[in-house]
Curated annotation (Swiss-Prot):
It catalyses: 4-CDP-2-C-methyl-D-erythritol 2-phosphate = 2-C-methyl-D-erythritol 2,4-cyclic diphosphate + CMP. It is an enzyme of class 4 (lyase). Its EC number is 4.6.1.12. Involved in the biosynthesis of isopentenyl diphosphate (IPP) and dimethylallyl diphosphate (DMAPP), two major building blocks of isoprenoid compounds. Catalyzes the conversion of 4-diphosphocytidyl-2-C-methyl-D-erythritol 2-phosphate (CDP-ME2P) to 2-C-methyl-D-erythritol 2,4-cyclodiphosphate (ME-CPP) with a corresponding release of cytidine 5-monophosphate (CMP). The record marks 39, 135 as: Transition state stabilizer. This is 2-C-methyl-D-erythritol 2,4-cyclodiphosphate synthase. Pathway: Isoprenoid biosynthesis; isopentenyl diphosphate biosynthesis via DXP pathway; isopentenyl diphosphate from 1-deoxy-D-xylulose 5-phosphate: step 4/6. Homotrimer. Keywords: Isoprene biosynthesis, Lyase, Metal-binding.
Length: 159
């Protein structure tokens, strides 16, 4: 394995379900009418970060590590999954440089709690995580409010 940095991309999408708690970017968004459906808490930002880390390290994907066949992760927080993903990446011989995640959806508006979200995900990851948000201008499942998505990029460096 060369000592060159490696980059991975992760994507996660969840349906929004009325009455479900809205966990996004390691935070509970009180007052949201719907939250992401999922085996765990459905935190698309944390899940995309996990997938980006796994991809960068060549360790598979979120489903391989935390999928529905693993009952111990049912209802798990995205922060818990991200902390475990970071541990596995380090155990495989990598240091985490940083992770960047973009949340795609109409709600919640991540910009108003960006610093808090970055702190929560960075704490879980043990490395800097930047958080941004965007919409699809009313197009597609996120634009219609049917779902929420996230896209992440991670940089890891072999030790």
């Amino acid at each position: 394995m060369s000592g060159l940095p490696r980059v991975g991309t992760g994507v996660d999408v969840h349906q929004l379900v009325a009455g479900r708690p809205c966990w996004v970017a390691g935070l509970l968004w009180e007052g949201e009418a719907a939250g992401p459906e999922g085996h765990s808490d459905g935190d698309v930002a944390a899940h995309a970060c996990c997938d980006a880390l796994f991809a960068a390290a060549g360790l598979g994907d979120l489903g391989a590590h935390f999928g529905t066949a693993r009952p111990e992760f049912a209802g798990a927080s995205g922060a818990r999954l991200l902390a475990e993903a970071a541990r596995l990446v380090r155990e495989a011989g990598f240091e985490i440089g940083n992770v960047s995640v973009q949340v795609v959806g109409n709600r919640p508006k991540v910009g108003r709690r960006r610093a808090e979200a970055q702190a929560a995900l960075s704490r879980a990851c043990g490395a800097p995580v930047s958080v941004a948000g965007t919409t699809t201008d009313a197009l597609g499942l996120t634009g219609r409010g049917e779902g929420i998505a996230a896209i992440a990029t991670a940089l890891v460096v072999p030790r």
